[in-house]
Amino acid sequence: MAKNLSAIKRIKTSERNRLINRKYKSVVKTLTKRCLLNIDNLESDNFNDVQSSISQVYSKIDKAVKKGAFHPNTGARKKARLARALSFAQKNRID
C-alpha cells in the first residue's frame, strides 16, 4: 500500500477513472450488440429503427473517445465496422 499522499491520491484517481472507463466500454458493447441484432433483422419497415440505433451507438462511441475511454482509432474502427455491417445488410436485402 502506498504511504505518501500523492501516491494515495493517484490510486484513488486511477480507480475512479477505471470504473468510469468500464462504464463507457460496457455501454458501447451493449449498444453495439443491440445495433448488430437490428441490422441482422433488417427489413424495409424497421430501417429507421436501425438508423436511430446506429446514431445512438456513434454518439456513445464519440463520447467515450472524448473522455479517453477509447483511443480515437479504436472509436473510428468500431464505427466503421458498424457502417460496413449495415452496408452489407442493405446489399443482401436488395439482392
UniProtKB/Swiss-Prot annotation:
SS bonds (residue pairs): none
One Pfam match: Ribosomal_S20p
SUPFAM superfamilies: Ribosomal protein S20
GO molecular function: small ribosomal subunit rRNA binding; structural constituent of ribosome
Keyword set includes Disulfide bond: no
GO biological process terms on file: translation
UniProt KW keywords: Chloroplast, Plastid, Ribonucleoprotein, Ribosomal protein, RNA-binding, rRNA-binding
Signal peptide coordinates: none
One annotated Gene Ontology cellular component of this protein: small ribosomal subunit
Localization in the cell: Plastid, Chloroplast
Role, per record: Binds directly to 16S ribosomal RNA.
Assigned protein family: Belongs to the bacterial ribosomal protein bS20 family.
HAMAP family assigned: Ribosomal_bS20
Name of protein: Small ribosomal subunit protein bS20c
Organism: Pyropia yezoensis
Taxonomic lineage: Eukaryota, Rhodophyta, Bangiophyceae, Bangiales, Bangiaceae
